[in-house]
Amino acid sequence: MASELKVDKFTGVTTAGSIDVTSGSTTTNLQEGLAKMVINYDQIADSIRSSLNVSSVSDNSTGDFTITFTASKTDINYSPSSSSLAYATSDRIGNFVGVRVTSGSTPNARSVGLFTGSLRINSGYGASASGAGNEADADANCVQTFGDLA
């Protein structure tokens, strides 16, 4: 017999913001598994189609933009995930989008785009007639982050 539970709010007994879910012998924390930021951003039109926990986006240059969070992260050890698609070009295959890393002669001299209040992203061509590795604006930059909020 199927059951249905209708509630407006779940609250943990020992910790209000922490709820464990058990499936078989595996237990996972519900809050830790939820995306804390989600965005579908059109860099060509400079418009946000859909978002969660995003206060703004700055279009820095071709294939380079910064997402500013409404609620900050606790640290820079969160996990971003992304995908990109350029509808407006014939080079639809092989696009990339990921965390921006500036060049430097050593790993310590490089700058990574992970910040507690924002995330800097690059998009471009992975392999195409327009140039492998070239930065380019994409119609659909979909980015999500997982990790604790401050």
Language model feature labels by segment:
Residues 3-4, 9-75, 133-150:
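Extracellular receptor-binding modules and their adjoining Ser/Thr/Gly/Asp/Asn-rich linkers
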Residues 3, 28, 83, 112, ...:
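Intrinsic-disorder/low-complexity peptide segments enriched for small residues
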Residues 89-150:
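Extracellular jelly-roll beta-sandwich "head" domains, especially the C-terminal globular C1q domain
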Residues 25, 83, 105-107:
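Intrinsic-disorder/low-complexity loop/linker signature
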